[in-house]
Design a protein with these regions (language model features):
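Short, basic/glycine-rich phosphate-binding loops at helix/coil junctions
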Residues: 14-17, 61, 144-151
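Nucleotide-sugar donor-binding patch of glycosyltransferase catalytic domains
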Residues: 71, 103-176
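Mid-sequence helix-capping/hinge segment at a functional interface
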Residues: 1-26
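Short secondary-structure boundary/capping segments
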Residues: 6-8, 38, 123-124
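Donor-binding and catalytic core of enzymes assembling or modifying cell-surface/extracellular glycoconjugates
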Residues: 30-115
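Short, solvent-exposed polar/charged micro-motifs at secondary-structure junctions
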Residues: 3-6, 57-58, 80-83, 141-146
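Short, Lys/Arg-enriched, disordered terminal segments
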Residues: 6-12, 42, 170-176
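Aromatic-acidic/polar surface patches that form glycan- and anion
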Residues: 26-29, 160-161
Length: 176
């Protein structure tokens, strides 16, 4: 575990990315998230958060592609991960727990919303609405399709992927 810590460049701003959510319609495509990571990893140190065997495996693969990207999944306890989260300059999260945890530490949280909506009451605590990226309401007028994101029409299941990586990159630069 300390081998990872010794490789992390703490002189750069730290961006945490939690690319998963409980429901698929709330999860941005990993391919598009890799574009975001590839664009920002030269300037920032990227820490990846997630849980579960499958997620951890995917994050490990992403981290092995770039010397400034580190997967903390399965490498650190939740308590240790919270220590990292508390030191982030920015957390990028889906509508999921990691964004809420970061917000409780006063970390700026950029949330990416699929079939849910922050106005339904689940925006991270004390965060500007400017830190939320939403799908286009004209294209997907039925959003939110459910409060938790567990129900959505078939044609909405990929709505979150209509958000261009460039939009996320631009928002990161505005916030940080």
């Amino acid at each position: 575990r300390h081998a990872i810590t010794s490789k992390i460049d703490f002189s750069k701003k730290l961006i945490g990315i939690a690319p998963f959510a409980k429901h698929k319609a709330k999860t941005y495509s990993l391919e598009q998230m890799k574009e975001v990571i590839g664009s920002i990893s030269k300037e920032y140190t990227i820490l990846l958060f997630g849980g579960g065997k499958n997620e951890s495996k995917q994050l490990k693969i992403i981290s092995e592609e770039d010397k400034n990207v580190f997967s903390l999944a399965e490498e650190f306890s939740l308590s240790d991960q919270l220590d990292f989260i508390s030191n982030l300059d920015l957390m990028i999260s889906m509508d999921s727990a990691n964004g809420h945890l970061a917000a409780m530490y006063g970390v700026k949280v950029l949330t990416i919303w699929g079939v849910t909506h922050p106005y339904a009451g689940f925006a991270p605590f004390n965060q500007s609405s400017k830190y939320s990226i939403l799908v286009d309401k004209n294209t997907y007028p039925k959003i939110p399709t459910s409060i938790y994101g567990n129900k959505s029409p078939e044609e909405y299941k990929q709505a979150i992927n209509s958000i261009a990586p460039e939009e996320i990159i631009k928002k990161i630069q505005e916030i940080i």
